[in-house]
Design a protein with these regions (language model features):
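Transmembrane helix-loop-helix hairpins at membrane boundaries of multipass inner-membrane proteins
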Residues: 1-92, 97, 205, 476-481
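Alpha-helical transmembrane segments of polytopic membrane proteins
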Residues: 3-8, 68-74, 248-249, 364-369, ...
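Alpha-helical transmembrane segments
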Residues: 9-13, 30-41, 77-78, 101-105, ...
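Alpha-helical transmembrane segments and their helix-start/interface "positive-inside/aromatic belt" motifs
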Residues: 18, 23-34, 144-150, 326-330, ...
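Juxtamembrane membrane-water interface segments that cap and precede transmembrane helices
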Residues: 51-64, 204, 351-361, 420-426
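Hydrophobic transmembrane alpha-helices and their helix-loop junctions in integral membrane proteins
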Residues: 82-90, 94-98, 102-118, 129-389
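Cytoplasmic/organellar membrane-interface segments at the starts of transmembrane helices
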Residues: 315, 326-329, 384-481
Length: 481
C-alpha cells in the first residue's frame, strides 16, 4: 500500500510538468490523474485502512491515511474531474491544466500530511497554484484579486510557520500530536494561520471576493476542494488533542452564523455561494468525527452550484427574477441546493444528521438554527422562475462538457447518500423536512421582500490583515483559558 500511495501522490506533479512537454495531451493527462484519485479515494472510503508512514525518520515527513483522508481525497478528485470535463471544449491552455493538476496534487498532499512542516510546504504550493489560476484571465481585476489572495495567504502562513517552529522547539518533532503540551503562543499562531487559510470566521472574509471573481471552473475548485485544506489540519488536530475541541466549536458556530448572515443578504449569486461556503465550513469543523462526510457533501454541491451560476444569464438576483431559467439548469441547481439544505436521499442529509448528532445540547441548538438559515439562503436559488417550454430562456448553448460535469456531480451527490444509511430514521426525516420548510417560509414571508446591504469594508485588504492581529489576541486568551 505504501508504494501505491507514494506513486499516487507523485503522479499529479509528474503529469503536471509533463503536460508542458506534451501540450496536445493536456486534457487527457489531467483526466487520467483525476480518475486515479477517484479510485484511490473511493478505495479509502469503502474499505478504510488506517496507516502511518514515516518517510525519512522520526523528525521527517509523516503521512497518515485513514477514512477522513479518503473522504477529502474523493471530494477533491470528483471536483477536479468535473472541472476538467467542464473545461474540455473551452480552449483552455496547457498552462491552465498544468496548474489545475498541480493544485489537485497539492490538495491531496495536505489530506495525508501528519506533520506541520510537510503541511506548510503543501499549503504554500497550493497558494501559488491557486494564485496562478485566479490570475489566469490576465485582466486587471483578476490579477488584483489573485495578488490579494496571495498576500493574505502568505501572511497567514508566516504566523503558522512561527508556531510550527515553536512546536518543534518544545517536542523536537513537527508531528500534529506535538500540539499537546505546546506553548500557548504556538497553538495560537498555528490556529491563526489555519483559520485564515480555511476561511473560518472573520479571518475568512477574504473568501467572498476571491471565489466570486475567479473564473467559473476555478471558483468550483476553490469552494469545492481547496478550502478544505485549511480546515482538515484543524479537524485532524482536534481528533488527536481533545483540549482544543471546545475552542474550535466556538469558532465553528460563529462561522456558521457569520456566513449565513452574509449569504442571506447578498444580491450576487457567486458572492452568495462564496459566503455560504464560509457558513458550511463551520458545519465541517464543528464535529470533527463527521467532518469527512460533510466536506464531501458540501464540496460536490458547491462545485455544482458554481458551475451552474457561471452559466446563468446574470449574477444579480433581481435580474434573475425577471429572466426565467431553463428547466434542466434549474433542476441541477435545485438538487445541489436541496442537498446543502439537508433533503433526504441526497448526501447533505446524512452529513447534517451525523454532524448534529455528535454535538452537545447548546451546540446542537445553535447549529439547528444555522441549518434553518442555510435553507433560507438556498431558497433564493430554488425559487427562481423557471422558463416554460413556450417561453424563451437564456439563449446560450451549453457544450457537452458542462452537462457531463453537472451529471457527474449530481450522480455523486445521490450515490454518496448511501454512505450514511443509519441516519435514515423517521425522527431525522421529519426534522430535516421541518428545517427546510421553516427556512422556505421565513424566506417567503420575510427575506424575499426585505433587502439589506451589508458593508464590504471588512473585506478590504488592510482590514483583513488587521483582523489577523485581533484574532491572534483572541486566540491567546482562549488558549490560556
Amino acid at each position: 500500500m505504501s508504494t501505491i500511495t507514494i506513486a499516487w501522490i507523485a503522479l499529479p506533479f509528474f503529469v503536471g510538468f509533463s503536460i508542458y512537454l506534451l501540450p496536445k495531451l493536456d486534457r487527457y493527462l489531467a483526466l487520467v490523474v483525476a480518475v486515479a484519485s477517484v479510485a484511490f479515494g473511493l478505495q479509502q472510503v469503502l474499505n478504510p485502512i488506517s496507516e502511518t508512514f514515516a518517510l525519512l525518520d522520526n523528525f521527517g515527513v509523516t503521512l497518515i491515511i485513514d477514512s477522513l483522508s479518503g473522504y477529502l481525497i474523493l471530494t477533491n478528485a470528483l471536483v477536479t474531474l468535473a472541472v476538467i470535463l467542464y473545461c474540455w471544449g473551452t480552449g483552455k491552455s496547457s498552462f491552465f491544466y498544468t496548474q489545475a493538476i498541480i493544485l489537485h496534487g497539492s490538495v491531496n498532499a495536505v489530506f495525508i500530511c501528519g506533520d506541520f512542516i510537510s503541511l506548510y510546504v503543501a499549503l504554500e504550493v497550493i497558494g501559488i497554484a491557486a494564485f496562478l489560476l485566479i490570475a489566469y484571465p490576465r485582466t486587471d481585476r483578476s490579477i488584483w484579486v489573485a495578488l490579494r489572495y496571495l498576500f493574505v495567504s502568505n501572511t497567514a502562513m508566516l504566523f503558522y510557520l512561527i508556531g510550527a517552529v515553536l512546536v518543534y522547539q518544545t517536542h523536537h518533532s513537527f508531528a500534529f500530536s506535538g500540539l499537546q503540551g505546546a506553548p500557548t503562543e504556538a497553538v495560537a499562531l498555528i490556529f491563526l494561520g489555519l483559520l485564515t487559510k480555511g476561511g473560518i470566521f472573520v479571518s475568512g472574509l477574504w473568501l467572498p471576493l476571491t471565489h466570486s471573481e475567479a473564473e467559473t471552473p476555478v471558483s468550483a475548485m476553490l469552494s469545492g476542494a481547496v478550502v478544505n485544506t485549511g480546515v482538515f489540519p484543524l479537524v485532524r488536530c482536534a481528533l488527536m488533542v481533545e483540549d482544543i475541541g471546545p475552542m474550535l466549536q466556538i469558532f465553528s458556530i460563529a462561522t456558521a452564523f457569520l456566513g449565513v448572515v452574509y449569504a442571506i443578504f447578498e444580491r450576487d449569486t457567486k458572492r452568495m455561494l462564496a459566503a455560504s461556503t464560509i457558513s458550511q465550513l463551520g458545519f465541517v469543523l464543528v464535529a470533527p468525527a463527521a467532518a469527512g462526510m460533510y466536506a464531501l457533501a458540501h464540496g460536490l454541491a458547491k462545485a455544482t452550484l458554481f458551475l451552474i451560476a457561471g452559466n446563468l444569464p446574470s449574477r444579480n438576483f433581481k435580474q434573475l427574477q425577471q429572466n426565467p431559467i431553463a428547466l434542466p439548469m434549474w433542476i441541477g441547481m435545485a438538487i445541489a441546493s436541496l442537498s446543502i439544505s439537508g433533503l433526504p436521499l441526497l448526501a447533505g442529509f446524512g452529513a447534517k444528521v451525523s454532524t448534529i448528532d455528535l454535538l452537545g445540547s447548546w451546540q446542537k441548538t445553535a447549529m439547528k438554527i444555522a441549518a434553518v438559515g442555510t435553507a433560507i439562503v438556498f431558497a433564493k436559488l430554488i425559487f427562481l422562475p423557471i422558463a416554460r417550454p413556450s417561453e424563451p430562456s437564456e439563449p446560450r448553448k451549453r457544450k457537452f462538457g458542462f452537462w457531463a460535469a453537472i451529471c457527474l456531480l449530481l450522480v455523486s451527490l445521490v450515490a454518496a447518500s448511501g454512505l450514511s444509511l443509519p441516519g435514515y430514521t423517521t425522527a431525522n426525516l421529519i426534522k430535516s423536512l421541518a428545517t427546510i420548510a421553516q427556512g422556505w417560509l421565513i424566506y417567503g414571508f420575510v427575506f424575499k421582500r426585505f433587502a439589506l446591504k451589508l458593508p464590504r469594508m471588512p473585506e478590504q485588504l488592510e482590514h483583513l490583515i488587521g483582523t489577523m492581529s485581533l484574532t491572534l489576541t483572541l486566540l491567546f486568551w482562549m488558549v490560556l483559558a
